[in-house]
């Protein structure tokens, strides 16, 4: 059909008609809110590079989680900030560690889906995501420590564990550890295609996890690559991942679509700290209106993400 028989504007003539033919819808069910929890009590500490985000003590986190649950939030992703760091990241798998305490209380006090970040970078003296020997991040030895972290989170009550380290074979190691200990129903949401991105800087500042030497390019993915992402995702699925993830989201919308179209499995995308801070800065400077938040998240959903991890969740959960 050609003009004038086909007029595309007919389906745009008012908001109700536009809603009827809308192809992509953003829902509260899509959102996961990443939170930072630290030792102490009655602490809610501003994060300078992430306006509107905070480091919470456990009691403050519980209060915030309850408020967000009342507004319709369904899921939360917990990142710990320990008091003590060492070369093995032992605070990460301490049964009385900050994440473990938070998970127990979140499960007692809320009905939220509780997801935990499984990594070592916040917990090690050197800030890398694995065990370091002679300034090299050793892969296979790291796996047993990551498995211990995941198991400790499952024992605390986590619904989902989310390995973010990008070590080869970590999903298999974690799945085997969970199965061996009777946690066969704990979900693994793997950071499958996690790129070595410059958009992580505000997060690293928030959790004090910048590497003491070098960078993470020997284990995180190289930004120019897309077919490599498919190999990473397939390996994680084969090793037992239930949900796969692309991180960051906005510079990698093509990867989200590629992963979703290729595998058709539940796919998460992480709208990371740098994306958040960049948009917040533009809004705060009146360069953009806050309408760009919804537009941004819609682009991630439209690209194929089933789940969106975003620091914007508290701002928009009541809007959608």
Curated annotation (Swiss-Prot):
Keyword hit for Lyase: yes
The entry's keywords: Heme biosynthesis, Lyase, Magnesium, Metal-binding, Porphyrin biosynthesis, Zinc
Cofactor(s) needed for function: Zn(2+)
Enzyme class: lyase
Pathway: Porphyrin-containing compound metabolism; protoporphyrin-IX biosynthesis; coproporphyrinogen-III from 5-aminolevulinate: step 1/4
Pfam families named in the record: ALAD (PF00490)
GO cellular component, one term: cytosol
Residues annotated to bind Zn(2+): 119, 121, 129
Residues the entry annotates as binding 5-aminolevulinate 2: 273
An MF annotation (GO) of this entry: porphobilinogen synthase activity
Name this protein carries in UniProt: Delta-aminolevulinic acid dehydratase
